[in-house]
Structures are given as C-alpha cells and as structure tokens.
Curated annotation (Swiss-Prot):
Molecular functions (GO terms): ribosome binding; RNA binding; translation initiation factor activity
Signal peptide: none
PANTHER family named among the record's database cross-references: EUKARYOTIC TRANSLATION INITIATION FACTOR 3 SUBUNIT 11, EUKARYOTIC TRANSLATION INITIATION FACTOR 3 SUBUNIT K
Name under which the protein is recorded: Eukaryotic translation initiation factor 3 subunit K
InterPro entries from the UniProt entry: ARM-type_fold, CSN8_PSD8_EIF3K, eIF3k, PCI_dom, Transl_init_fac_sub12_N_euk, WH-like_DNA-bd_sf, WH_DNA-bd_sf
Pfam families, per the entry: CSN8_PSD8_EIF3K
GO cellular component: eukaryotic 43S preinitiation complex; eukaryotic 48S preinitiation complex; eukaryotic translation initiation factor 3 complex
Subcellular location: Cytoplasm
Record's subunit section: Component of the eukaryotic translation initiation factor 3 (eIF-3) complex.
Species of origin: Cryptococcus neoformans var. neoformans serotype D (strain JEC21 / ATCC MYA-565) (Filobasidiella neoformans)
UniProt-listed GO biological process terms: formation of cytoplasmic translation initiation complex; regulation of translational initiation
Length: 250
C-alpha cells in the first residue's frame, strides 16, 4: 500500500538492503576519496538504473569524488543521479543534497573540456521539475515532462530510457503524497495528477492497494490521512504567569 514515508524507512534510505558489501566499504571506508574507485561506483549507479534500485548515499559518494576531482566528472552520470533523486521523494532532501554538491553546469563542462550542452540544458529543467514536485503541482509537472521543449525531449529520449520505470517511480511518490493528505479523491483528479488515462486509473488504484467506489478512489487509513481532534492542556505555574504579565507591561 502506498503511504507517506514512515520512520521505518529511514534505515533503508541510509543503507539500502540492495547495496553490496564492497560498495558499502567504498562509501564508508578510508578509501572513499580515492578517485580510482569511480569506475566501480559508476557501474553501481548503472545497476541502480537497470534494476530500479536507489542508493542516495552511494550516489552522493560519486558526486563527492567529482567535487574533489572535477576533471573526472561525467555529465550523463550527474543527470542520472539527479533523476534518481527526483523520483525518490516529493518532500525529502535527496535532490537538494545532490544539487548542493554540484557547481554550475558550464563550469563542470569547462573542467572536462566537453562541448555536449545536455547538462546545461537539462540540469535547470530538472530543478524546475523538482520545484513542481516539491510544491505538489503534479499536473504542471506532467505538462513539463510531456512538453516539446528541448530539455524535455532530451530527458525523454536520452535519459529516461536508461531507467527501469521512471514514470511509474514519479507516480508512486506522487501517490504517497496524495495518500498522506486524502481519504477519498476523484478518479478524474487522480488521472490528471498521475498522468494516467481515465480507463487505466482503476488498474493503478489496484496496484497501490486503493479501492474504487463509483467515481472515487478510497485510500485506507495510514496514520497521516485520518485527522483526529485533540485537546492540548497547558500547565502554567503561578511564577510563570507573573513573568508573563510583567513582560506584557512593557
């Protein structure tokens, strides 16, 4: 069932079960800043893309090596890391953590003496997508993805095909965000927010273990979408009240 990210997922976020021991040693060992490890780390990223896995700290380790060894930077790897971070969470820090370790695209290309402008075009575009995702403007997000802009075309034809199921990854994190706020939502709204044809929305609901009632999708309780009234009691001591009244006199 798709729900908002729970604390139980934090360990998997930090140390995913799919991470091989040798990669774990490279990330956390004394050899973590050795640039000769880059080929192994980049191969690990390629496995992430192919298998639909995600290892934020493994990807950050690659960006850290690029930071210390800018001449080894690979623009395609950078873009794929940003795509993985973008597709991992709506409200988490993943994308910004990756972004903070990168300089301007033009500076990166200058260091590696590359004339390929894809990084210059796509990186700001991914930042735009992240802003739309972060602010839950899901319909506009899909409009950007499906647009005829140069950046969108490069993303769709050159990079997304390298990933196992990127569009469904976006749909899953959007569904998690929706599930944290709604108990019931219309299928037509869900179709727009998830960019799914109206006749396929029911299939998606089944995939994420939601039920369909008439023209609505019904989302089970998950601890965040079942708002309950509560009473907060404050125990204010006389001494505290005296200080408050005295402060109000100024």
């Amino acid at each position: 069932m798709v729900t908002a990210v729970s604390p139980e997922n934090l360990k998997e976020w930090h140390t995913p079960s799919t991470r091989p021991d040798v990669i774990h040693e490279l990330i956390h060992g004394v050899d973590r800043y050795n640039p000769s490890n880059l080929p192994f780390m980049e191969d690990y990223l390629a496995t992430e893309l192919k298998e639909g896995q995600y290892d934020l700290f493994g990807n950050l380790a690659i960006l850290k090596l690029y930071q210390f060894n800018p001449q080894h930077s690979n623009p395609d790897v950078i873009i794929n890391i940003l795509i993985k971070a973008l597709a991992a969470t709506v409200s988490g820090p993943d994308f910004n953590l990756c972004l903070e370790m990168l300089r301007e695209p033009s500076a990166i290309l200058h260091d590696i003496e590359s004339a390929d402008e894809a990084l210059v075009i796509v990186m700001p575009y991914l930042q735009r997508l992240h802003e739309l995702s972060r602010t839950c403007q899901f319909t506009k997000f899909w409009q950007e993805i499906n647009s005829d802009s140069e950046a969108a075309k490069i993303l769709r034809t050159r990079y997304l095909p390298q990933h196992a199921s990127p569009l469904d990854d976006f749909r899953f994190i959007f569904s998690a965000s929706i599930a944290s706020c709604f108990r019931r939502i219309s299928l037509s709204q869900l179709s727009r927010w998830l960019d799914i044809p109206s006749d396929k929305v029911g299939e998606w609901c089944s995939k994420v273990e939601w039920t369909v009632e008439g023209q609505d999708a019904v989302i089970p309780n998950n601890g965040q979408n079942d708002v309950k009234a509560g009473v907060v009691k404050e125990n204010v001591q006389l001494g505290q009240l005296t200080k408050l009244v005295a402060a109000a006199g100024y």
